[in-house]
Amino acid sequence: MKKQLVLGVLFVFPLLVYLFFASGKNNFAKLPTLTPNIQSLPINKDFSNRSVTLKDHISILGYWGGDLSDKKAEALNLNEKIFKRFNGFDDFQFVFFVNEENEEEVQALKNALQTGTGTDLSNWYFLPSSPKQIQSHFQSLKTPYQLNQQYSTPYVFIVDKNLNLRGRNDDEDMEEAKLLWEKQIEKLRQSIGS
């Protein structure tokens, strides 16, 4: 009798655990569309000459422009918080607009990610872009944010398979976070200037 009970528990319990986790919510589907039909990519090849498109992909879109000096920490954070979690999906990708003159800096950043954390960069795309292309595409998102003088922003954006910008539009902490970020930047500028 004990053997049958133990065997029953060993078979039924994993099945119940699987059913519990399989019924989990897909939070991405609940994100509202903030901007429908954003502009498609003005460039269809990355620095490594690989084809890239937003259509039919779930994309994390970043605008790093000519400001790559301090992006290693952001890249590592994005890798840990987002990429490692969703890397198994074939249609998931990171796409970054980068100044077309920054190929060496992009390669150094990629090397740091690969050697430091062993990141698989097959779904990371760095697009060589002109400032005009970066600005034009960023404006198609219609967000309240601005690019800095280097055509860069610390924010990343979620774009769905149909080129819709997704995200939260009721974030109570957004203004507070923006003010805090601006204060941090101002402190950094003051420390560099003095």
Across the structure, where does each feature detected by a protein language model lie?
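Periplasmic c-type cytochrome electron-transfer domains
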Residues: 34-48, 73-76, 104-108
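Structural micro-motif
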Residues: 122-124, 142-157
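Thiol-/selenol-based redox modules, centered on thioredoxin-like
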Residues: 150-194
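N-terminal targeting signals for export/organelle localization
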Residues: 1-46
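Structural microenvironment flanking redox-active thiols in thiol-disulfide oxidoreductases
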Residues: 73-127, 131-137
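Short, surface-exposed amphipathic charged segments that create phosphate/polyanion-binding patches used
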Residues: 138-146, 161-164
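Extracytoplasmic
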Residues: 55, 89-92, 151-154
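Short active-site neighborhood of thiol/selenol oxidoreductases, capturing the structured segment around
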Residues: 50-79, 94-95
